[in-house]
Regions:
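Short helix-loop "hinge" at the ATP-lid/N-box region of the Bergerat-fold HATPase_c
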Residues: 134-135
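Short conserved segment of the HATPase_c
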Residues: 166-179
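Conserved micro-motifs of the catalytic ATP-binding
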Residues: 72-77, 115-118
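Conserved catalytic submotifs in the C-terminal HATPase_c
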Residues: 78-81, 100, 105-114
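Conserved glycine-rich
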Residues: 205-210
């Protein structure tokens, strides 16, 4: 009961933050529209920083809400036969802007079509978090590899970056809620993205695992054939 109450509290707090965050977003947009020509350069930099902070906070709040609701069973996955490749590419499209800002290139090797039983909305969320994690901890002007292979039991989607990676023994820990790897200290993030992704995958009878690379990290998402 205590765990449930804590989850409910987190969900409620996160939900209450939505309104002030929406106000910040709206006022930032209004401020940007009313820029004075003589102050345009300076104001643009301030607004850019403000919008970046607002986007990070929004992402954090939404992640808390989704995690709490999933754990409480308020939101459930609804699987049906969908094109898994399309789901992956949708998530990739959402992260493209962040990748471009760091001049990160995605090297994608996927088949044109794989029909797989999954919840396309939640799996898009799961893949987005994996891609976001890879971009976040990759160096500027680097690449991220995305590949897929099929075994007798699973579709294996691998996402390999060449970033800061993890230390020995952290392969399972990085999927724990709020866990931050030793290498990730000092970087933005709250340790909830990969946890949420794994929960989504587990609800669809799949599994996730991580492998230390030199350099970087490999995340593998397995979904049943």
């Amino acid at each position: 009961k205590s765990k449930y109450e804590i989850q409910k509290l987190i969900s409620e707090i996160a939900h209450q933050l939505r309104t002030p965050l929406a106000n910040i977003k709206n006022y930032t947009e209004l401020l940007q529209e009313s820029l004075n020509e003589t102050q345009e350069t300076l104001n643009t930099e301030y607004i850019k920083d403000l919008r970046t902070s607002e986007e990070q906070l929004c992402f954090l709040v939404e992640s808390f809400i989704k995690t709490a609701r999933l754990e409480q069973g308020i939101i459930q996955v609804h699987t049906q036969k969908e094109n898994l490749v399309e789901t992956i590419l949708n998530a990739l499209g959402q992260i493209q802007k962040k990748a471009e800002e760091k001049e990160i290139f995605f090297q994608v090797e996927l088949p044109e079509k794989i029909i797989c039983e999954h919840d396309k909305n939640w799996m898009c969320e799961a893949f987005y978090n994996v891609f976001d994690n890879a971009v976040k901890y990759s160096k500027n002007n680097s690449r991220i590899n995305i590949t897929m292979k099929q075994t007798e039991m699973f579709y294996k989607i691998q996402v390999r970056d060449y970033g800061i990676g993890i230390r020995d023994g952290e392969e399972n820990k990085i999927f724990q809620r709020f866990y931050r790897g030793e290498q990730a200290r000092g970087q933005e993030g709250c340790g909830i993205g990969l946890y949420l992704s794994r929960e989504i995958v587990l609800l669809q009878k799949g599994m996730m695992k991580a492998k230390q690379m030199k350099p970087g990290l490999l995340i593998e998402v397995n979904l049943p054939v």
